[in-house]
Design a protein with these regions (language model features):
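Bacterial Sec-dependent N-terminal signal peptides
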Residues: 1-24, 235
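A glycine-rich, acidic short-motif signal
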Residues: 49-60, 69
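Aromatic-patch recognition
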Residues: 59, 66-196
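Sec-dependent signal peptide cleavage junction
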Residues: 18-52
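Long, compositionally biased interface segments
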Residues: 195-242
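N-proximal short alpha-helices
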Residues: 50, 177, 188, 204-208
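Exposed alpha-helical structural elements
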Residues: 29, 102-105, 110, 203, ...
Length: 242
């Protein structure tokens, strides 16, 4: 069953009769998540990407597909991350695949939660967390550092800005744009809670009030920046020792 991962994935996307008969929703297999229900959801998501066609910019930080391993998938596959939709696209390697079936969206399910690029550039994790706006999110974060259950995560994000039609003949239409947003950083504590990475000493101490003296000593000795990614990794490493 595992050897036909792509065939099963394609079959569900095309809603073929054979897929419906061979892959019932209740069956516990490595491709069970690619059920009719999920295919409908992700087909709708793919259709929505049509909004990008006339937009300036890209929904991807890297438009190229990259070989990666995905938990729950027995073989490496080529993927790319849609930073606007916060979703992963799996390349369809079938010969003569139609233009609108060149890739499929990966279901956001626990069994596919770890995505590691083979070239070592990215380790994506599907997690539940509260974003910088205190909104509950089930989405992908990039693992930048991990030790003793303390993890530094990075969020790459692209915003879609709708275009505007000119109000009169003297003005010009404004096209839709895809704009890279400022990266967000999160810290997973030993309790497994994921919080926004502290922006200063005061906020770091607020997370570990009983370790105030140790934190003050570390910051005074090392003088790390709370906005530099490399220094954030050093702070996370220090936190892992608390």
């Amino acid at each position: 069953m595992k050897k036909i991962f792509f065939s099963a994935l394609c079959a569900f996307t095309f809603f073929s009769a054979s897929a419906q008969s061979n892959f019932d929703i209740g069956r516990q297999t490595s491709v069970d998540a690619f059920s009719r229900r999920n295919t409908e959801l992700y087909r709708e998501g793919r259709t929505n990407t049509e909004k990008y066609e006339k937009a300036i910019g890209s929904a991807y930080t890297n438009e190229k597909f990259t070989l990666a391993t995905i938990s729950g998938v027995p073989e490496a596959v080529s993927v790319r991350y849609n930073a606007e939709a916060d979703s992963f696209e799996v390349q369809n390697n079938e010969t003569n695949a139609p233009a609108d079936k060149k890739f499929f969206a990966l279901p956001k399910q626990t069994e596919y939660s770890n995505i590691d690029f083979k070239n070592g550039t990215y380790k994506f994790r599907l997690l539940n967390y509260k974003d910088v706006n205190d909104k509950e999110v089930n989405g992908y974060l990039i693992e930048k550092f991990s030790k003793n259950d303390v993890v530094l995560y990075k969020k790459e994000k692209i915003n879609y800005i709708k275009g505007r039609v000119a109000e009169n003949s003297y003005a010009m239409d404004s096209p839709a744009k895809l704009v890279r947003a400022k990266d967000e950083f999160y810290l997973q504590l030993k309790s497994k809670q994921i919080v926004e990475f502290p922006k200063n000493k005061k906020k770091l101490i607020a997370l570990f009030e009983d370790k105030k003296e140790a934190i003050n000593t570390y910051l005074k000795t090392n003088d790390p920046s709370f906005s530099d990614e490399n220094d954030m990794a050093k702070i996370a490493e220090f936190v892992s020792t608390l």
